[in-house]
Amino acid sequence: MSNSVAQARRWTEFLARRLEFPAGEALIAQFEAGQIERLCDCGCNSYIFSPSADPAIPLLAHADGKYGSVFEVLFRAGADNATVEFLVFANGNGALAGLDVHYCGNAYPMPEAVVFLEPPIHVRTSPSVVA
C-alpha cells in the first residue's frame, strides 16, 4: 500500500477511534491543525508531522521536553501471523510529531489490504498521554 496523505489520514483516524487510545480527539485536532512534513517512502506508512503552534489545539501528552513514543499498539494481521505496529510520537511540547505504521516490524512493505485480528496483542500508553 503506497504511502500518501490520504493513507496517513486513514491510519490517524483509525487510531483516534480505538478505545485503547485515550487521546483520540486530541490526535485528530493535532492532525487537522498541523501538516505532514514527510511521508516515508520505504514501504511503511509512516509520517513525520509538523504541529500547529496554536495553543488552543489540545496536546497529546504533557510537555516534558522530550521527543518520544507516547502510544503503541500491535495487531496480528491475516492468517500468516503477520503484524502491524502503530507508534504515535509526541514532541517535547506534547504535540503530535509523527506516526510509524509498520508491517512485520518494517521487514516488508505494507500490503494493499490488511485484515486486523482483534484484540490487539500489545498496547502501551505512556503515562504522559493526556486522557
Regions of interest found by a model, annotated:
Residues 1-74, 110-131:
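N-terminal domain-onset segments
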